């Protein structure tokens, strides 16, 4: 609203920067995962249609890149610069490729849960979604040695936030895009912390309409998005910048 709270960031900082690595490859729709069709969402094959009842070999290969090469390149980059990351890690992907998680833990990164599967939960029965959440927690706890404290589904149902809050062990969820600061949800029976995420300063826009075509475009957009709350004299309140 017109009088947002003043976030007291350490050292009087104006902007809290959060870098997020979505580790999803291995949890997407695929015939080999028992799904009725191949993945169609967020790939270099723009507008890809799902293959019903058949494997999409190119799509499977595209999604395999993350665990084979992409994640390691990013982890090396953040290690070299000593910058912390939050991994939104899909539990099925964690289980298939635990070495990525082991490396992230060794580097001191936060591992938040991104659900059991990287699928659309809209319309899923509440009992099934709750079972997926419990399975994600079990896998995460086994691989990481402790349960997840952060949660992000991505493609939620109308029940997701309540299910997450009722589980009782999470410090926050990030299934929200509505604010520049964390806030307490009033949609649950008990106070539940929301740390908003972003689909704006997000490299998924390389695979969406009106997105980015070059690294220079993405870099310029990130710089503008960061500089705006810092340089405008009337924007004096601390904020979060998420990438």
Question: Could you describe each region identified by the protein language model?
Answer:
Residues 1-11, 19, 135-142, 146-232:
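Active-site-adjacent pocket scaffolds in enzyme catalytic domains
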Residues 233-239:
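Conserved small/polar residues in nucleotide/adenosyl-binding loops
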Residues 42, 66-71:
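Early transmembrane hairpin module of multi-pass membrane proteins
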Residues 46-57, 72-75, 79-159, 188-190, ...:
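Metal-dependent polysaccharide deacetylase catalytic core of the NodB/CE4 family, i.e.
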Residues 60-68, 126, 215:
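Short acidic-aromatic active-site loops that bind/stabilize oxyanions
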Residues 25, 117, 178, 239:
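Short, glycine/acidic-enriched loop or turn micro-motifs at the edges of active sites
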Residues 1-58, 62:
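N-terminal regions that are enriched for targeting/export leaders
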């Amino acid at each position: 609203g017109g009088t947002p709270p003043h976030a007291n960031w350490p050292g009087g900082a104006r902007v809290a920067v959060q870098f997020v690595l979505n580790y999803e490859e291995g949890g997407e729709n695929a015939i080999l995962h028992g799904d009725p069709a191949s993945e169609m969402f967020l790939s270099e094959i723009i507008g890809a249609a799902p293959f019903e009842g058949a494997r999409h070999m190119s799509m499977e290969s595209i999604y395999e890149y993350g665990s084979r090469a992409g994640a390691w390149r990013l982890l090396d980059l953040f290690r070299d610069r000593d910058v912390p990351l939050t991994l939104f890690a899909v539990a099925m992907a964690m289980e298939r490729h635990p070495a990525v998680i082991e490396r992230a833990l060794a580097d001191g990164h936060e591992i938040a849960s991104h659900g059991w599967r990287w699928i659309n939960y809209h319309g899923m029965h509440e009992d099934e979604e709750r079972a997926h959440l419990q399975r994600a927690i079990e896998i995460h706890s086994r691989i990481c040695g402790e349960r997840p404290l952060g949660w992000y589904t991505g493609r939620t149902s109308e029940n997701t936030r309540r299910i997450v809050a009722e589980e009782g062990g999470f410090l926050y969820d990030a299934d929200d895009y509505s604010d520049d600061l964390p806030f307490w949800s009033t949609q649950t029976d008990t106070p539940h912390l929301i740390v908003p995420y972003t689909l704006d300063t997000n490299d998924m826009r390389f695979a969406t309409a009106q997105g980015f075509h070059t690294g220079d475009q993405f870099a310029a957009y990130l710089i503008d998005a960061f500089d705006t709350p810092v340089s405008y004299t009337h924007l004096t309140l601390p904020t979060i910048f998420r990438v």
